[in-house]
C-alpha cells in the first residue's frame, strides 16, 4: 500500500505518496512591503488594473508602497482593491476603510468605466461583427440583438446611473454638503442583472451556431466576453465592499 506523508517547511506544503510530491505555491501577501512584481504574478488579472491607477510597467524590485508613492496612489486603497478583486470573500473593516482616499477610489472607478466603454466593448464589437456577418439571416440578427442588449444594460448602469447620479452625489458629500434626495442605500439595489442577456448570447455562440462557422473566432470572442463579464462582476464587488460602506460612513458622520 502506498504511504502518505506530510512535510512542512518555510516554502511549501506537501501531502502526497512517498514517491510523488505535490508542490503548492505559497500565497504572496497583500502588504505594503511585498514586491510589486510578486503581487502581479500572484494573480495575473491584477495587471489589467494598473492602467486604471495610472501605474506603468518597469517597477523592478520596488515594493508596493514604493510603486504607489511614485505614482501618487493611496497604498491602502490599491492593496484593498487588489484584495477584493483577487479574493471575492474579502471584506474590509471600518478601520481599514478609514485609511483609504475616496477621491482615488472614484478616479479608479471612472477609469474602469472608460476602459470598458472605450477599449473592451469596441474590441469585442470588431470581432463579433465578423461572426454576425458569417451567420446569415438565421442567427446573425439574433446574436447582434443579444449583444446590444448586454452592452446597453452595462452602459445604463455605469454611464447613466453611476456617472450621472452616484458619483456626483459622493463628490457633494466630500465637499461637506448633504442632499436628502438620495442616499447610498439606493445604489446597492440598482446593480442591473445582465446575466440573462449574457447567457442568451453565449448560448448562440457556443451551442446553436453551426460548428463550421468561424469556430476559432467564436472561441476567442467567447473568452473575451467571459473575461469582460468576470471583470465587471469584480468591479461591482469593489463598489459593494469598498465604495458603499465608505459612503455610508460619510453619511452617518453628517449632521
Which residues fall in each region the model found?
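Short terminal hydrophobic/aromatic SLiMs and anchors at protein ends
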Residues: 9-10, 20
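Small-residue-biased structural context
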Residues: 15-255
Amino acid at each position: 500500500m502506498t504511504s502518505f506523508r506530510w512535510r512542512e517547511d518555510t516554502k511549501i506544503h506537501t501531502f502526497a505518496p512517498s514517491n510523488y510530491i505535490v508542490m503548492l505555491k505559497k500565497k504572496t501577501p497583500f502588504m505594503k512591503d511585498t514586491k510589486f512584481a510578486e503581487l502581479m504574478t500572484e494573480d495575473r488579472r491584477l495587471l489589467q488594473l494598473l492602467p486604471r491607477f495610472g501605474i506603468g510597467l518597469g517597477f523592478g524590485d520596488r515594493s508596493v508602497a514604493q510603486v504607489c508613492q511614485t505614482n501618487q496612489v493611496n497604498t491602502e486603497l490599491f492593496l484593498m482593491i487588489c484584495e477584493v478583486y483577487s479574493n471575492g470573500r474579502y471584506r474590509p473593516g471600518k478601520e481599514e476603510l478609514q485609511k483609504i482616499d475616496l477621491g482615488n477610489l472614484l478616479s479608479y472607478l471612472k477609469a474602469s468605466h472608460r476602459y470598458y466603454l472605450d477599449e473592451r466593448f469596441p474590441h469585442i464589437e470588431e470581432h463579433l461583427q465578423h461572426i454576425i456577418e458569417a451567420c446569415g439571416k438565421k442567427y446573425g440578427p439574433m446574436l447582434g440583438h443579444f449583444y446590444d442588449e448586454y452592452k446597453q444594460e452595462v452602459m445604463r448602469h455605469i454611464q447613466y446611473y453611476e456617472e450621472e447620479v452616484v458619483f456626483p452625489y459622493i463628490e457633494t458629500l466630500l465637499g461637506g454638503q448633504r442632499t436628502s434626495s438620495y442616499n447610498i442605500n439606493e445604489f446597492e439595489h440598482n446593480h442591473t442583472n445582465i446575466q440573462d442577456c449574457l447567457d442568451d448570447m453565449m448560448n448562440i455562440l457556443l451551442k446553436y451556431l453551426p460548428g463550421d462557422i468561424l469556430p476559432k473566432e467564436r472561441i476567442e470572442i467567447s473568452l473575451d466576453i467571459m473575461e469582460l463579464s468576470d471583470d465587471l462582476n469584480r468591479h461591482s464587488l469593489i463598489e459593494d465592499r469598498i465604495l458603499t460602506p465608505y459612503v455610508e460612513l460619510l453619511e452617518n458622520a453628517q449632521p
